[in-house]
Amino acid sequence: MAPPRKRTRDLMPKFLNTESFDEFNQRLNNLPAESNVTSDEDAQFLESRKCQSKRWRKEEPLKLNLRSPWNVLCSPESISSAKFIVEKTCLIPVPSFEEAATNARRCLNTSSIPGSSGSASETNSGSDITKQDFKNDSPSDSKKVQGSSTSKSAKPKVIKVYSFVDLVTTTKKGNIQTEESSLNHEKKLGTVVDIVEPMKCDERSKEVQGSSTSKSAKPKVIKVYSFADVVTTTKKGNIQTEESSLNHEKKLGTVVDIIEPMKCDERSKEVQGSSTSKSAKLKVIKVYSFADVVTTTKKGNIQTEESSLNHEKKLGTVVDIVEPMKCDERSKEVQGSSTSKSEKPKVIKVYSFADVVTTTKKGNIQTEESSLNHEKKLGTVVDIVEPMKCDEGTKCEVTTTNKGKIHTEERSLNHEKKLGTVVDIVEPMKCDEGSKCEVTTTNKGNTQTEERSLNHEKKLGIGVDIVEPMKCDEGTKCEVTTTNKGKIQTEERSLNYEKKLGIGVDIVEPMKCDEENKCEVNADTFDVVIVEPMKCNKVTKCEVNVDTTGVNIVEPMKCNEVTKCEVNVDTIGVDIVEPMKCNEESKCEVNADTMSLQKRSKRAVSLVERFTEEEIKLHIMSLKKPSTQSAVEGMCDLKEEEESCQLCDDGTLLFPPQPLYCLLCSRRIDDRSFYYTPGEEELSNAQHQICSPCHSRCKTKFPLCGVFIDKHKMLKRSNFDNADTEEWVQCESCEKWQHQICGLYNKLKDEDKTAEYICPTCLLEECQSINNMALVDYTDSGAKDLPETVLSYFLEQRLFKRLKEERYQTAKATGKSINDVPEPEGLTLRVVFSADRTLTVNKQFASLLHKENFPSEFPYRSKVILLFQKVHGVDICIFALFVQEFGSECSQPNQRSTYIFYLDSVKYFKPERVTFAGEALRTFVYHEVLIGYLEYCKLRGFTTSYIWACPPKIGQDYIMYSHPKTQQTPDTKKLRKWYVSMLQKAAEQRVVMNVTNLYDRFFDSTEEYMTAARLPYFEGSFWSNRAEIMIQDIEREGNNELQKKVKLLSRRKVKTMSYKTTGDVDVDDVKNILLMEKLEKEVFPNKKDLMVVELNYSCTRCSKAVLSGLRWFCEKCKNLHLCESCYDAGQELPGEHIYKRMDKEKHQLSKVQVNGVLFSTTEDNDIIQENDMFESRQAFLAFSQKHNYNFHTLRHAKHSSMMILHHLHTSNKHHCSQNSSSLTCTACKKDVSTTIYFPCLLCPDYRACTGCYTKNRTLRHLHIFPTLPSANRAPSRTVMVLEILNAISHALLCQHKTTKSCSYPKCHEVKALFTHNVQCKIRKKGTRCNTCYKLWQTIRIHVYHCQDLNCPVPQCRDRKEVLIRKV
């Protein structure tokens, strides 16, 4: 058997020899093999010795924890019968022998061995076998030691402690936070503590108690590097209180030796006791800083600071100040006597007595009192080594009283009473506030007076020796009287230095303002302009208190790295050109209840700056959602060393690659697929690509764009390599990086890279400090700031009305309260493009129809309508509509028709609920926008609207670039159903008269002369594109072939499609007939998708609109409508027509009177808006793809919409600057030359903008405005009220006794109103009659505009006198 290890043997008792231990170890720790077990007793014994854990495959001998006393182990026999104890828990590092017992795998039943005294938590005796369980304690936790150690490697009763961190109990209730520090190290440690290395960055209280007996440390000496932050902080609302209690006497009880200066010790640090260490002098403590034993109390805007440094009780020893106390921002006072050998006895070198000032502020009145009872606190001679530069400790006593607009300051320096010693001023007093002159300031109205008096003889008691000239020395400042009356300012200076100083004054240089001085500004007036900033000295502390408005600081107040700047701004209108940059080492306490102090032009680069606190929180939460992160396909792997975005927690992100289409199959190449490009020089620079499936099917050589391409020479590329990377931006406040899209950063506003960007997180903190107000007020950044048009006003008001009705119906259908039904918020509808364009007809198509006078071009107006919804503070574009309007000035067949060109949407509409009819609210809103547009066109006199239900292919975009992945692309059937549902609603609202399709309207008609010239011609329409291709095919055929094909046609087709009735046709007629025949075959399968919507009836034969007069129609034939002229010229018998197809069956005709529409012509006097971005659908899509304005995620949709609005506002500013005029709103004087307004129909020069018209209800009662606003000085439409007003004046003078005999319009109706008013029984009962109320409303309008003093209208003169008295 091998002997035990050496390290184990060294730890054994000396009287136990090696042979005995070997025999003992053999009996206890060696087990027989399983194959050698012969008896049941041996098997049971072997089973009990096996390890319980399955992971421990290797069995090793368990070394016992032998305890003292060892005198019982006197022989091997006693060992064999000994009873041993195994520890289960140990809190301290143990000797090597005990470590072996800790890691043991097996244990053996032995006789009892007496255990040594200790702190074992659990013991087992006899046959109880226990495996030791040790807890792993972190270095930051407390370490306890008990007992004695005889190990040579460790000193007895000494613990090396590196940090006592965070033994603090923190309680937070609401906005109130309390911290309590309780370091009862006596109870926890109980031993000597040796601090080996300085506790750097130990932010909590660290305290040590006990005595040290370790050899590495001196006896009863503790090396302390920092006693920081034993402070109890209580915060209640806006009131914060700090109390510092350093009872080091009770906690330490030993001598404290401060080895190095306590740098950056921001809280109170105090030392007590005596030092017996060899490195420090007897009973001398080296103190480098006694800082901030200050109790601060803040109530509302009132802040009070009290300084109490009772060093006598806390120190009780001599204080030796080795070096000057730099960066000591609070009151620093020293007491006692010095017995150090390097310094004189009972002399303290003082470099600064700063700011023992009590400040009290009540409302706009601020009072400061300085009390330096140095006699009681110091009691020793004060030696001022260097001049006190802006020494706040010797600052004069200032009493400030502010009553109304009168401001008074009084200063008194009783240095004799406070110091009690002679003051030796070595160098001249440069702005020494301790000897600052007494200033009395009086402000009465706009007059300000300042009086200064330097009674230095009385205050200092010594002669004043001025070595150098006084450069703006506030202590010797001249007496200045300033008077400000209106715009005239007068200053008077009087230098009575003989009286004040007692010596001659030699002024060598002008008094320049010393940057080291401290300026105390208390301004209660307006328009105070400080040309240069108040620069803060490194040693001084700047306290700025601005209680006024209109203070314009040209340059910022720069904060020194060492000083603390306390800024208390309770006003607004403070405009600082550059921000106040605070050093990292300094603490800036900012209390701002007003607008941000940053320059607005330098902060207008992020849209988040206009958000409220709630909007910023919602925006940040939306970026943290996992769906936002996973939606990005092109996200790169985030490396370990790569910095992630602070807002979305993602690294480098990629935009979706630009869409590429295969030249052979015209399909879009997937974003992550491969494609091939030709390597030939002829096609290398062009964008020609082939998808992988087409490349695999191609031959070795194949033609492409007129060039033969070698398949093996083509280059393989990845579409994912074409993706762009999202750009980053760094916050100027926290210096963290975010994606420009996450931070809603607008780089177009920071092209010169001089603007300051603040991230949403920092803006949230700033927003919380200014009472939930937007930091920057953008006046031209939202969708509502876009100019309104007549169409947008009509659609928006109609949409809001319909949403209210839907909400009421949903609440009624579901049985809920109307407040429980969510409504969409933040909807804004604007027309962003409206311009006149011309559609050019294909030359071959125009030459084919030249005999029918088919025009070569069609003028129309193109419009783009966008719907925005504010989501998390951002106006997101959720719906887009492109339309073309062909007005009454256009030729047939496009006259008075509109074409729904394209529409598109993204699925970000809120809320996501269903209506009472069971459809999505999002669908309801989009339907109402379309129905509203059709109604607007109907009122303007349009007769027909054409819709082509053609959905985009999967992966293809119509208007908005890159839709969300969760949004499904509808097929043709779903899209057609969507349009049919919308048209059914329009028919129920009597907006649409009839809905048919293109085939039934033009190809299956019962009337004659249905040729290609009757078909409307639109850009990009289904039938127009097909017709152009068919004409090219017809032109390739010869005339003989055309004649043969005409003979194959039926006689009915030839007669229906030809103008001639003789039966002879020429070549052009043949081409026309063949074209209509081919178009009919193409249109018939898709006729349900080609919808024709009739807004107003038009004549089937002449295609003219039937807007007034009689309209003849057939009840059996849906598409037959005749005007009066066509009916009179017809060959049928009066009152009937012949149905041609069914053997000339005769149908009866009916007639109806048509009421005229509001507009006789479709002339559009709305605002003209032009920009290159929305010139066409393809232009906007290409613009979005170029700048990566996509909508596939919410974060991208926010940023893209923000940038689109920026481009719109920029183009509108340029447009308004060119078209602005003197046309303004009469009420608010707003320029309405480039927007819409409401003109009064009675007052020729009175006009109201949309804001005044909407908000001012009285204005609408006193003036007569049209139903729709006007624009571009267009003449307004008359209304019914104007006709009634004219009829009232006529009816009172009318001589006809009967109403039927008078031909004046509305005369008999007005007379009936007056008769009813006299005989009304409802009004006589005291209740309100609606008919009488409407009459008196009309009379009130008449009174407001009537200029006749003898007006015969009833009550006109009485009401006019009342109106004059009010004015």
Curated annotation (Swiss-Prot):
Residues 130-144 have a biased composition (Basic and acidic residues). Its EC number is 2.3.1.48. Acetyltransferase enzyme. Acetylates histones, giving a specific tag for transcriptional activation. No acetyltransferase activity found in vitro. This is Histone acetyltransferase HAC2. It comes from the Eukaryota. Residues 110-151 are annotated as: Disordered. Acetyl-CoA binds at residues 903-905, 922-923, 978. Residues 188-512 are annotated as: 12 X 13 AA approximate repeats. A zinc finger (PHD-type) spans 688-765. Residues 780-1213 form the CBP/p300-type HAT domain. GO terms for biological process: chromatin organization; regulation of DNA-templated transcription. The keyword Nucleus applies. It catalyses: L-lysyl-[protein] + acetyl-CoA = N(6)-acetyl-L-lysyl-[protein] + CoA + H(+). Zn(2+) 2 binds at residues 1225, 1228, 1249, 1252. Pfam families: HAT_KAT11, PHD, zf-TAZ, ZZ. It comes from Arabidopsis thaliana (Mouse-ear cress). InterPro entries: CBP_P300_HAT (IPR031162), Histone_AcTrfase_Rtt109/CBP (IPR013178), TAZ_dom_sf (IPR035898), Znf_FYVE_PHD (IPR011011), Znf_PHD (IPR001965), Znf_PHD-finger (IPR019787), Znf_RING/FYVE/PHD (IPR013083), Znf_TAZ (IPR000197). Sequence repeats lie at residues 188-200, 223-235, 251-263, 286-298, 314-326, 349-361, 377-389, 418-430, 432-444, 459-471, 473-485, 500-512. The lineage of its organism: Eukaryota, Viridiplantae, Streptophyta, Embryophyta, Tracheophyta. A zinc finger (ZZ-type) spans 1094-1157, 1220-1273. A zinc finger (TAZ-type) spans 1274-1359. GO terms for cellular component: nucleus. Signal peptide: none annotated. Zn(2+) 1 binds at residues 1099, 1102, 1123, 1126. The keyword Acetylation does not apply. It is found in: Nucleus. Residues 111-127 have a biased composition (Low complexity).
